[in-house]
Each structure stands twice: as structure tokens, then as C-alpha cells.
């Protein structure tokens, strides 16, 4: 059973748990300083299988690391949720609530696939309506640009998917930096791009190649020749992925 810190236990009785992952619980709660606004509270619960001292140390370290990443990116003009408050001892991060759809859901809406994932990868007969193409391209190019700014800041997300990019007033905001790390390595950034590429293939199979082309168009417009090594490494990562698929 998950034991919540006292302040979060009070919130959880009246507010909503909106997401639950392997490492954290995410709540929508009242903003601590602006009562008329909501914010997001991310909580890393205790792991009963760890030694308590080690668990507390890891939770504090990861909470502080995520907060530092958010602060670094905000200062670097990358669109991410603004930090509101952190309680590293209890594994809590309060941050801005981004109002809008995930890019995944937005694409499904644009495709007319409200159930999500209903299209099959082999169904090539379904083309995008003319009016949607411009909107899809413009938005995915913007997403690629935001990823480019992320990597130029030497931050690797660790779980780049269309679920972890929100659209606020049509502009992308990258969320969920629980697996993020600082890295200057082209290999790490290439793996980040590969994860996004595979996510697009999985959740938007019919037009995945076109969507990825637009993402990379935006990415390269930001990083330019400075990240040419990243794209070369991406091809290496793809080849390793194909080999693993063949070997099962």
C-alpha cells in the first residue's frame, strides 16, 4: 500500500490522480500560492523492496535531478512546465499544469481517429485530408524544433513520445522528465530520437514516415550541422534495433 506524505494525503482526498507510472504518481491539485489556479504534483512513492535509507536517498536525488533539469531548460528557452515548489525529502515536485492535448491525442483527432490506434500500419488507402496536412506539418515541425532545443541544452529526455509532448495554444511543451539526464553524447541523443521514432510508428502507423520526416525537419532546423553526428548515430541505433527485431 502506498503511504502518502501528509500534505499530499490531504490533497488526494479532494483532487484527482491523473496518471500513475512505475516511478511516480501525478496529481492535479490546487496551486499552493495562487488559489484560483491548478498545478501538477508529481510524487515518487516509497519502494518497500529497498532499504529505507537507500530509498530516501534515491528519491531525494531523483527529485532534485528532475527539478534541476526543468529549471535548466526553462532558462534555456525550452518549453517545459514551470517549477512551482519542490519537497525533495518527500519526493514531491509541484509544477505548472499544461492545459491542452497531448500530441498523440491531437494527431488522432486530426486524423479523425478518435478512438486512437484504430488504423492499421498496412492501411495505405487512408490519406490525410488536404486541410489537415498543413496543420500537421507545422505542428510536428515545431515539436522537432523543441526537441532540437532540448538536445542543444545537452539534456536527454529518456522517454520521448507523442504522449510526453503537450500542445498549449498550438505550441509544444515537453513534459515528464523523470528519466531525463544531462549528456553531451551523440549516442544518447540519437537513442532519444529513436524512441520518438518508434513511438510515432507504434501510435500513428499509417503516416509515421511522413510525421517523422517533419519532426526531423524541425529538429535539424535548430541543431544544424552541429548535431550531424547525432543523425549518423541514429542510423546506427536503427540498425541495432532491426537486428534485435530479427533475432526476436
From Swiss-Prot:
Q: Residues that bind ATP, according to the entry? A: 18-26, 42
Keyword list, A-Z: Activator, ATP-binding, Chromosome, Cytoplasm, Hydrolase, Kinase, Nucleotide-binding, Nucleus, Phosphoprotein, Serine/threonine-protein kinase, Telomere, Transcription, Transcription regulation, Transferase, tRNA processing
The chemistry this enzyme catalyses reads: L-seryl-[protein] + ATP = O-phospho-L-seryl-[protein] + ADP + H(+); L-threonyl-[protein] + ATP = O-phospho-L-threonyl-[protein] + ADP + H(+)
Please provide an example of a Pfam family that matches this protein in its UniProt record. Answer: APH
Q: Which InterPro entries match?
A: Aminoglycoside_PTrfase (IPR002575), Bud32 (IPR022495), Kinase-like_dom_sf (IPR011009), Prot_kinase_dom (IPR000719), Tyr_kinase_AS (IPR008266)
Predominant cellular place of this UniProt entry's protein = cytoplasm
Q: Name one GO biological process term.
A: tRNA threonylcarbamoyladenosine metabolic process
Query: Gene3D superfamilies from the xrefs?
Result: Phosphorylase Kinase, domain 1, Transferase(Phosphotransferase) domain 1
Q: What is its EC number?
A: 3.6.-.-, 2.7.11.1
Quote the subunit structure annotation.
Component of the EKC/KEOPS complex composed of at least BUD32, CGI121, GON7, KAE1 and PCC1; the whole complex dimerizes.
Q: What is known of its domains?
A: This protein is considered an atypical serine/threonine kinase, because it lacks the conventional structural elements necessary for the substrate recognition as well as a lysine residue that in all other serine/threonine kinases participates in the catalytic event. BUD32 has protein kinase activity in vitro, but in the context of the EKC/KEOPS complex, the catalytic subunit KAE1 switches the activity of BUD32 from kinase into ATPase.
Report the protein's function: Component of the EKC/KEOPS complex that is required for the formation of a threonylcarbamoyl group on adenosine at position 37 (t(6)A37) in tRNAs that read codons beginning with adenine. The complex is probably involved in the transfer of the threonylcarbamoyl moiety of threonylcarbamoyl-AMP (TC-AMP) to the N6 group of A37. BUD32 has ATPase activity in the context of the EKC/KEOPS complex and likely plays a supporting role to the catalytic subunit KAE1. The EKC/KEOPS complex also promotes both telomere uncapping and telomere elongation.
- Protein name per UniProt: EKC/KEOPS complex subunit BUD32
Q: Which organism encodes this protein?
A: Yarrowia lipolytica (strain CLIB 122 / E 150) (Yeast)
